Curated annotation (Swiss-Prot):
This is Protein pelota homolog. It comes from Picrophilus torridus (strain ATCC 700027 / DSM 9790 / JCM 10055 / NBRC 100828 / KAW 2/3). It is found in: Cytoplasm. May function in recognizing stalled ribosomes, interact with stem-loop structures in stalled mRNA molecules, and effect endonucleolytic cleavage of the mRNA. May play a role in the release non-functional ribosomes and degradation of damaged mRNAs. Has endoribonuclease activity. One of its GO terms (biological process) is RNA surveillance.
Length: 339
């Protein structure tokens, strides 16, 4: 993502570069916000001789007051729907699709938290390209790390199940199927193999033999669990601290654990009103907000008080996000307890 902020006009122009950029955009836009983009409208022309109408779509620049956003995880488009507020089509409904390569102009005075949030995408700190293969003797799951979640890429069965599994199971074919699926994923720079039993290490050795993976950093870790749980646990382990500790999901996991650990000591609080009171007292060190609460109008009141405080926006699509939502979407870690 590239952004250009005009302080005088209170506009932000965004060049969308990746799929993940769409998630960031979704979380700073709300109904009522104004955007500018290119829409394709039909112009009617009357043929005087045939008295018929023909139509064609032409690109026009329009300003839209947003009514709704349609964002689907792991897709390359976001759909913005609203009402045109200027020009010949003023008052008419319009939708615009945005994806990588498009430019979006927002007429909005972004607050400090929203700017910091967009700067994550600008710095490309959590770019895609990190793949996890989590497996055991029965099945393998392949995940692509996104900024906001793990994307399911493939599920491969080994056929090593049932009383007569030995008639169907072929370990070599199992590994070949996994490797074939991995080769279909583009722009990978880090591949992490994890899981239980002997299969993860065997797969790792097969991958290392394949010249296709020569330019990819391949790692192997034994874990106590498989699937997404295995990946989440690995993200927060000391074993990977020097490799993936700066991933967004690893940070979310650490922040959540600190919040939960401090609940018993009174150094963690939750709930909008409770946090609002602690902000007034200057006692909050870290403010943790769920993705959907970040977009709420009342949240801006909290953020206006939170200057200089560490703020984390937690994705809805992760385990930490689900837990933060169960606490009402507003959580905080305190500098000190107030009696």
């Amino acid at each position: 993502m590239k952004i250009n902020i005009d302080e005088k006009l209170e506009t932000t122009e965004i060049l969308i570069e990746t799929q993940d950029d769409l998630w960031y955009i979704k979380n700073i836009l709300n109904p009522g916000d104004i955007i500018e983009g290119i829409a394709y409208r039909r112009l009617e022309k009357r043929n005087d001789l045939e008295r018929s109408k023909s139509t064609e779509r032409i690109p026009i620049k329009v300003k839209i007051k947003i009514e709704n956003l349609d964002f689907q995880p792991f897709t390359d488009k976001i759909k913005i729907l609203g009402i045109i507020i200027d020009g010949d089509f003023s008052g008419e409904h319009q939708s615009i699709m945005y994806g990588p390569g498009d430019t979006l102009k927002i007429y909005k005075n972004l607050n400090e938290a929203e700017r910091d949030f967009l700067n994550e995408a600008v710095k490309n700190e959590y770019s895609s390209g990190m793949i996890f293969v989590s497996l055991d003797e029965e099945a393998a799951d392949i995940y692509l790390m996104r900024s906001y979640s793990l994307q399911d890429m493939a599920h491969i069965e080994s056929n090593k199940t049932g009383k007569r599994y030995d008639l169907k199971y072929n370990e070599k074919q199992y590994f070949l199927d996994i490797i074939k699926a991995l080769k279909n994923i583009k722009n990978v720079f880090l591949l992490i193999v994890l899981g239980t039993g002997f299969e993860p290490e065997k797969l790792y050795n097969e991958i290392k033999k394949d010249p296709f993976f020569n330019n990819i950093d391949v790692k192997f870790y034994n874990t106590y669990d498989t699937g997404k749980s295995g990946v989440y646990n690995l993200l927060n382990s000391d074993a990977t601290s020097n490799i993936i500790k700066e991933s967004r999901m690893a940070k979310e996991k650490r922040i959540l654990e600190t919040f939960l650990r401090n609940l018993n000591s009174g150094l963690s609080v939750y709930g909008y009103d409770e946090i609002n009171n602690y902000l007034d007292n200057g006692a909050i060190d870290t403010l943790i907000i769920s993705e959907e609460k970040f977009k709420m109008p009342e949240t801006r009141e909290l953020l206006n008080k939170a200057s200089g405080i560490k703020i984390y926006i937690i994705s809805n699509y992760t385990e930490p996000g689900e837990i933060i939502r169960s606490f009402g979407g507003y959580c905080a870690i305190l500098r000190y307890k107030i009696k």
